[in-house]
């Protein structure tokens, strides 16, 4: 299974992005639990999940910075 592409994360809207981040965090928790109980079979899933989480959080941060840098127009300035 190839690593997910960041373009896929950029296509998500804000709500879907938050849901995906939470899902990735839950998946990491599950993987850690399986590792602790010696039930983990696919160790490569750690890498894939961490990679996906990093991509999602990067996209989220890009959007935050973009929103901050966008000039806000107040009714007084119009």
Swiss-Prot record:
InterPro entries: Ribosomal_protein_uL29 (IPR050063), Ribosomal_uL29 (IPR001854), Ribosomal_uL29_CS (IPR018254), Ribosomal_uL29_sf (IPR036049). Keywords: Ribonucleoprotein, Ribosomal protein. It comes from the Bacteria. The keyword Ribonucleoprotein applies. The keyword Ribonucleoprotein applies. GO terms for biological process: translation. GO terms for cellular component: cytosolic large ribosomal subunit. Gene3D superfamilies: 1.10.287.310. GO terms for molecular function: structural constituent of ribosome. Belongs to the universal ribosomal protein uL29 family. NCBIfam families: L29. This is Large ribosomal subunit protein uL29. It comes from Rippkaea orientalis (strain PCC 8801 / RF-1). The gene is rpmC.
């Amino acid at each position: 299974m190839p690593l997910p592409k960041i373009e896929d994360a950029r296509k998500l809207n804000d709500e879907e992005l938050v849901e995906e981040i939470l899902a990735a965090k839950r998946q990491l928790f599950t993987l850690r639990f399986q590792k602790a109980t010696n039930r983990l079979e696919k160790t490569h899933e750690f890498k894939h999940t961490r990679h996906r989480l990093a991509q999602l959080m990067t996209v989220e941060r890009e959007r935050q910075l973009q929103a901050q840098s966008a000039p806000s127009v107040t009714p007084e300035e119009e």
